[in-house]
């Protein structure tokens, strides 16, 4: 049903953009069921995050046009977020993302692991989904790209495992840059855990 709905929306010329209602699981299941010829012939924005990463990456590999890693429709949005996405989806012939960062974004703690200037295609999303699609035909080429990643409810050792998978597959070594975003509740709840912290895992994989 989800694949049929998505195919219908991309075949309908009256539909300007497709907003995912929520994330969760299962987006990868529908990839072989999508009409990629119709999707390529009818470009329109796909907006969502989390499990929707599977669709974003497949679109980057198969459709040839960008999508938006942004809020799902069921999320609670600030007014500036909704206004920005509305302009992107409906108010411009050529979508352009711009403007100053909002208060929430500009006030967050950030640190630089490896300094410098990078330019490249922006690819990524949920780290679990990125690593799950490794070795399939649904990933775009990462050479020269800037990879952004986020995740939720994953223990430090699982984050380490997924980053190690990207390293062993050669992905980390061919990137122009990496942005490691929010990792909500990414800590183990196992009693007596004495492994690496999340910061240590990130530094081990991304530091010079």
Show the residue positions of the predicted features.
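ATP/NTP phosphate-donor binding region
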Residues: 1-14
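Short, acidic/small-residue loops that bind anionic groups at enzyme active sites
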Residues: 34-58, 66-73
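Oxyanion-binding "anion nests"
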Residues: 122-166
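C-terminal active-site/capping subdomain that shapes the small-molecule cofactor and substrate pocket
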Residues: 162-208
């Amino acid at each position: 049903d989800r694949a049929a709905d998505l195919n219908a929306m991309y075949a309908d010329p009256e539909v300007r953009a497709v907003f995912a209602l929520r994330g969760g699981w299962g987006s990868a299941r529908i990839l072989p069921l999508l009409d990629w010829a119709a999707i390529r012939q009818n470009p329109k924005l796909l907006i969502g995050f989390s499990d929707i990463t599977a669709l974003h990456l497949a679109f980057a590999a198969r459709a040839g046009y960008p999508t938006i890693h942004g809020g799902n429709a069921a999320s609670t949005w600030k007014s500036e977020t909704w206004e920005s996405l509305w302009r992107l989806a409906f108010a411009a012939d050529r979508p352009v993302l711009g403007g100053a960062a909002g208060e929430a974004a500009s006030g967050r703690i950030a640190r630089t692991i490896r300094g410098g200037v990078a330019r490249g295609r922006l690819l990524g999303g949920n780290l679990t989904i990125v690593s799950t699609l490794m070795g399939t035909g649904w990933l775009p080429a990462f050479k020269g790209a800037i990879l952004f990643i986020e995740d939720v409810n994953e223990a430090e050792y699982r984050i380490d495992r997924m980053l190690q998978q990207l390293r062993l597959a050669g992905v980390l070594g061919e990137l122009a840059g990496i942005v490691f975003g929010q990792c909500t509740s990414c800590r183990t709840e196992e009693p007596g855990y004495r492994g690496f912290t999340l910061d240590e895992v990130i530094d081990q994989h991304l530091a010079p």
